[in-house]
Amino acid sequence: MRIVFMGTPGFAEVILRALVENKNNQIEVVGLFTQIDKPFGRKKELKAPETKTYILENHLNIPIFQPQSLKEPEVQILKDLKPDFIVVVAYGKILPKEVLAIAPCINLHASLLPKYRGASPIHEMILNDDKIYGISTMLMDLELDSGDILESASFLREDYLNLDALSLKLAHMGATLLLSTLKNFSSITRKPQDHMQASFCKKITKADGLVDFKDAKSLFLKSLAFKSWPEIFLENNLKLLEVGLVENEKSHKEGEILEIDEKGVLVGCLKGSVRIARLQAVGKKPLKAKDYLNGRRLKVGGILA
């Protein structure tokens, strides 16, 4: 079984690794298509996609392609690889009909479709306080995440997970699911999506990290969803790090400092309260909340803003 893999971030790298290291010798990854290396960090140094890095660091004999678009000659390159399947996991590009015609294109999407079509399904699961997390394999068509569902898997939330932890758990679950889909493809009954039930999610931007002290639960969920980037910050760009939900019932002044101790600062919201362990001002290193407040001479009864 010849597989062309299309994927870019760490989530996709987990899936690629599972395909490459699978004990079933029938699976052969014959090519990786991924995004171009992009500037990263303050120094804007070029950083390779995690999928590419995995192949290079492990000295795997898998050709790597980083095309700007999927037109000619890329379509011919794909044809020459003679794939039995094209597997797509967080690739970041739309596949044109010329590519879809080469071989069955299977997309592993991190949601229970038709829920959360689009670029940020794992963020949306967290932000919407979902009780069930899941993942789907889908036969791709020309529309965004709208193809027939092949298989799905899910689990009941036992505790709150931040983006990194949930992504990793879903990636490992997705790897198992994808291997099942590839093995059983010919016998799987495809399930058309109910497009009336579809919901959509957008690409996350820096502005999504802006928070206030109106609703404690919402602030807490954003801290989980945006942990890696863009993080969460107030209007003055003060970052709130390591946020815990204390309660979501009582009413307080917005941003009122209720308590200060070694664990952090307890801050009131119009609904509920949160405990913040560390704070980071613009251009400064993160500080324990207590030390930051002492430096600003903020005490219980004051307003964190």
Enumerate the predicted regions with their spans.
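N-terminal Rossmann-like dinucleotide-binding module
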Residues: 1-42
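Active-site-proximal loop/hinge segments within enzyme catalytic domains
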Residues: 10, 142-246
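Conserved beta-strand termini and adjacent loop/short-helix elements that scaffold enzyme active sites
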Residues: 35, 65-67, 140, 152, ...
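N-terminal beta-loop-helix "entrance" segment that forms/cooperates
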Residues: 38-57
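Alpha-helical oligomerization interface recognition
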Residues: 68-136, 140
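Internal anion-binding site segments
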Residues: 195-305
